Structures are given as C-alpha cells and as structure tokens.
Amino acid sequence: MKCKTRWEKKFDCFGREDGNILLLFAGSLTVLIFFIGISMDLGLIYLKRNALKNLCQLVKEDRFTFQDSIRYSNNPGKDSFTMIEDAIRRNHFDGTVKVYFKEDIPETNYRYYKIRTQLSEEYSYTFLKIFGADTTTITVYFDGGETYGEGISDVIWHPALPVSSYNGSYTSQPDGSFGYDSADLPADW
C-alpha cells in the first residue's frame, strides 16, 4: 500500500474537479469581457452625446449675434435655419440639423417666436456589432426664442409674409439643401 505525503493529501481535492475551476474561470472571463464591451459602447455614446450638447450650447450662445438678423428678416424661419446650420457646419458637424420655428401671430406692439434646434448623428457601435447591432442615432435638442415689445406705444416690425408661410421645420439634406415642412412642429409646443 502506498502512503501519501502530506502535500499530496492537500492537493488531492483538486484532482476530483475535472476542470470545473477552469470552466468557471473561462465563463467569468467571458462575462467580464461582455460587460466591458457594453460599457465601452455606452461610454462612447455618452461622449458623442456630450459633444452634440456642446455644439447646441455654442449655437445658443451665438443667438445674441443672430438676434437682430432674425428679428428683421423677411423669412425668419429660413434665415434662422441658415444661420444655425452655418455655425454648426463651421464646427465640423456632419449629421442632420433640424430647426423648428414657430411664431405667434404678431400684434403691432408685440412679437414672440420659439426656435428648437435638433442635432442628430449616427453612431457606429464597436462591440455590439458582434451581436448584429450596427448603428444608432444620437439626438439632442435645445429650445430658444425671443419676446419683444412691451408697451402699448411700442411699434414692432413684422415680415410681410404671414407666419403660416415660415412656421414649421427646416431639415438639412445631404446635398446641402434643406427640406421645409409647415406641419412638422414638436408635440410639446
């Protein structure tokens, strides 16, 4: 009869595992890589979304530069879109720019309009492509507007066109033109 040494007795329990620890290690490593990959994609989406928000903030800060140009424009919806899109494109944005413009029917001493700028860009997944997900659209927007005219004696300039001719959405097209839809306004307006 063979007598086992003390060390052989201690490691004898590992001989009965038949690779279970190895399988457990491989499985947990696979799960860990999966969660790291998903975290990486979500982190990159978050970074892209923050970059779009920064562009929105840039245009929002420029609104005082554009304010009089919009105020005295014959077509303030189209001119708002043109100015906003130019500012966005100068900052190397290649996605879709959509500007919603809505002005209330002006009175002789009062004028109010709202502008919503919406930026959309495609994000191509890095890790989730393994599971068949290719792209997702990241969209951010910000609202702005202006009210002017306070007193009864204020005289406010208005465009000759009725507000229904320039209220709506203006969407950039890949060829550099834009599309106009008078019925497309945000639901929460």
Task: List each model region and its residues.
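Short, conserved structural patches
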Residues: 2-3, 7, 69-189
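Alpha-helical assembly-interface signal, strongest on the long, hydrophobic N-terminal helix that forms
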Residues: 2-81
